[in-house]
């Protein structure tokens, strides 16, 4: 897809068929369908009183929310009295190419379980629930109005083939549809396979992804002066987010923001 041919219309979003807008007849029949087959909470399975909320009230309350005290730079949860003007303890002494990273949940407990089911359990349908959580957070924070393009962190083609989908792509698509934003699914390419970041130390994570991403040639002019939202499932050390942002800034992006469903807690203040 070239920048000139990309569209902000949801119909242009390369999402799975169930993410597209359904025909009028199906929409008309939807109340009867929901009455016969009520939706269930994605976390505990109980029938939902309010459709399209994905979580029952109890599970929604029990999710490990980052809360109002978060680092304004990397998005990690911090104490209520933490000094974060220059970042938190986990990020203030690091160079980060992105302007800000945000996440509604901590990567623990039920959030970790759902994300692992999503990408490793191949539960692509969870993109709707997790994308809705992230979308609610972006809407409340106002960040959805601060970007021009939405781009997923790309997977290497071998990993995408084995998994069947790129979880970041599905989340990015949910956000593009909800906020009517321009989706750039092929803005970045992963140039080489990398080790799974989970078992690596912070320093090794940075080395692992350094040089792993590139801006695709058709976007070299389309990204100039744009504010880009990079989307992924989990923010751990920020190595992947930093490398993606570094490539985009080098390509002329005005600003890069990062949005993930969950954040691994690292800061002590």
Question: What role is predicted for each listed range?
Answer:
Residues 1-269:
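Glycine-rich phosphate/pyrophosphate-handling loop used in enzymes and phosphotransfer proteins
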């Amino acid at each position: 897809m070239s920048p000139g041919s990309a569209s902000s219309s949801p119909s242009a979003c390369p999402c799975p068929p169930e993410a597209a807008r359904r025909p009028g007849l199906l929409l008309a029949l939807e109340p009867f369908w929901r009455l016969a087959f009520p939706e269930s909470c994605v976390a505990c399975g109980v029938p939902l009183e309010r459709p399209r909320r994905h979580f029952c009230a109890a599970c929604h309350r029990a999710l490990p929310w980052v809360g109002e005290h978060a680092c304004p730079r990397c998005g990690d949860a911090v104490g209520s009295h933490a000094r974060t003007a220059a970042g938190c303890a986990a990020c203030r002494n690091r160079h980060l190419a992105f302007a800000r990273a945000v996440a509604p949940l901590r990567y623990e407990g039920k959030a970790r379980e759902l994300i692992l089911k999503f990408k490793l359990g191949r539960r692509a349908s969870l993109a709707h629930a997790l994308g809705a959580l992230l979308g609610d957070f972006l809407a409340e924070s106002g960040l959805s109005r601060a970007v021009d393009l939405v781009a997923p962190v790309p997977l290497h083609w071998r990993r995408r083939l084995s998994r069947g989908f790129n979880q970041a792509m599905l989340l990015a698509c949910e956000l593009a549809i909800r906020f009517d934003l321009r989706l750039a699914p092929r803005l970045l390419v992963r140039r080489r396979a990398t080790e799974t970041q989970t078992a690596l130390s912070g320093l090794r994570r940075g080395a692992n992804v350094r040089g792993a991403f590139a801006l695709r040639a058709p976007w070299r002019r389309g990204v100039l002066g744009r504010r880009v939202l990079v989307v992924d499932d989990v923010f751990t050390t920020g190595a992947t987010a930093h490398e993606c942002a570094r490539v985009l800034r080098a390509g002329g992006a005005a600003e890069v923001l990062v949005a993930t469903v969950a954040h691994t807690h690292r800061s002590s203040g």
